[in-house]
């Protein structure tokens, strides 16, 4: 199950490797893009429209739940994780990839959250890696791997295009970049390169397993 599949790239990657995939998204428009991608690549991918926080599947329906670069939009990450645990078969895996907030850098975190909210008003919040670890364990998962990799934001115009940012919000972001605090510049590597504004996002990759026998937070 690929939750918040968007244009379906993760679902397609898995299907190309022989995995039976259900691609799910709250947006019918995104599901249509995922279907187009599947047709282009000759892949058999099922699609379902629903929110991440309420999965319309029976318990233990899947052996893998994935969610790539989407969880920061969710109304409740806790509900998503609780539902992911429920629909996973015991021993099943959860893979989450998403932007993250830097640890121990509250000024940089506030700047990053503010910039992202202006770029894309549907943004909720980037969690810190430690918050992710705590939440998945509270829901009953065992963390197998949790790593942050730097992802380069190559230029402001690219950043705006990917979200269709309004002109008014673009102007506000440029102002925040110009007045960025020293901690944000240092922690995020905010700089000018060949006339382009760049910085480095923390991107979390988290792999967790539903134990063979365990109680979830929803069952306690």
Residue ranges, per PLM feature:
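A short His-aromatic
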Residues: 72-73
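Short alpha-helix
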Residues: 125-139
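Conserved class I S-adenosyl-L-methionine
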Residues: 95-118
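Class I SAM-dependent methyltransferase SAM/SAH-binding core
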Residues: 1-3, 7-54
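Conserved acidic residues
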Residues: 63
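A short glycine-rich, Lys/Arg-flanked "PGG" loop and its adjoining helix->strand segment in the class I
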Residues: 78-90
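A conserved beta-strand element that flanks and buttresses the S-adenosyl-L-methionine
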Residues: 66
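Conserved Class I S-adenosyl-L-methionine
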Residues: 145-220
């Amino acid at each position: 199950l690929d939750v918040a599949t968007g244009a379906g790239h993760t679902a397609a990657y898995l299907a190309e490797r022989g995995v039976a995939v259900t691609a799910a998204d709250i947006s019918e428009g995104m599901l249509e893009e995922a279907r187009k991608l599947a047709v282009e690549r000759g892949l058999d991918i099922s699609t379902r429209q629903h929110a991440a926080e309420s999965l319309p599947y029976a318990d233990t329906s899947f052996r893998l739940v994935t969610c790539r670069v989407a969880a920061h939009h969710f109304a409740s990450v806790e509900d998503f994780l609780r539902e992911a645990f429920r629909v996973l078969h015991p021993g099943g895996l959860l893979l989450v990839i998403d932007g993250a907030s830097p640890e121990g850098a509250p000024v940089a975190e506030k700047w990053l959250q503010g910039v992202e909210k202006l770029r894309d008003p549907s943004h909720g919040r980037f969690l810190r890696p430690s918050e992710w670890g705590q939440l998945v364990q509270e829901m009953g998962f065992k963390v197998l791997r949790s790593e942050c990799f730097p992802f380069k934001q190559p230029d402001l115009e690219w950043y705006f295009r990917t979200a269709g940012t309004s002109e008014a919000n673009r102007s506000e972001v440029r102002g925040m970049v110009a007045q960025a605090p020293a901690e944000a510049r240092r922690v995020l590597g905010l700089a000018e390169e060949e006339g382009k504004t760049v910085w480095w996002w923390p991107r979390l990759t988290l792999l967790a397993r539903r134990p063979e026998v365990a109680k979830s937070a929803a069952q306690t």
